[in-house]
């Protein structure tokens, strides 16, 4: 365990609002571990510092190495995830925008704003530099 990991994590959280790109914070929810009202308040404090465009509340899945530490009972139902999301959303001045029951996920944010998708290229451009900022791209008109 890296003793400085939490400090680095907090620095990253505080850096996120200055980035000129869409930001998504993902919360992997584990029943009986991090879904209580106290945990929701703590998630909200971090989310308010990060000021993400979206928050993805996703249920833990009992696969891989995690099976050594957790059990099937730690997998929240979709209703559990929606309950968490509906309690978190007003604490971060957002709302539940979308959900997927088969994926056990909820999307929290202020609004869904589509961005243009460029035409596919059949070759690599000579300049593969840094992608342009997405928050300043024109919006897609419906």
Residue locations for each model-derived region?
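Conserved AdoMet/S-adenosylmethionine-binding subsite of the radical SAM
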Residues: 1-79
């Amino acid at each position: 365990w890296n003793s400085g990991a939490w400090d680095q994590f907090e620095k990253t959280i505080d850096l996120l609002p200055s980035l000129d790109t869409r930001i998504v914070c993902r919360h992997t929810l584990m029943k009986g571990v991090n879904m209580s009202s106290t945990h929701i308040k703590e998630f909200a404090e971090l989310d308010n510092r990060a000021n993400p465009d979206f928050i993805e509340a996703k249920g833990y899945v009992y696969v891989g190495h995690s099976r050594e530490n957790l059990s099937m009972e730690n997998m929240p139902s979709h209703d559990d995830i929606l309950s968490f999301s509906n309690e978190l959303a007003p604490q971060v001045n957002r709302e539940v925008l979308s959900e997927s029951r088969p994926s056990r996920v909820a999307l929290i944010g202020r609004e869904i704003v589509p961005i243009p998708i460029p035409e596919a290229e059949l070759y690599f451009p000579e300049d593969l530099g840094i992608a342009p900022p997405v928050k300043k791209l024109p919006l897609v008109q419906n």
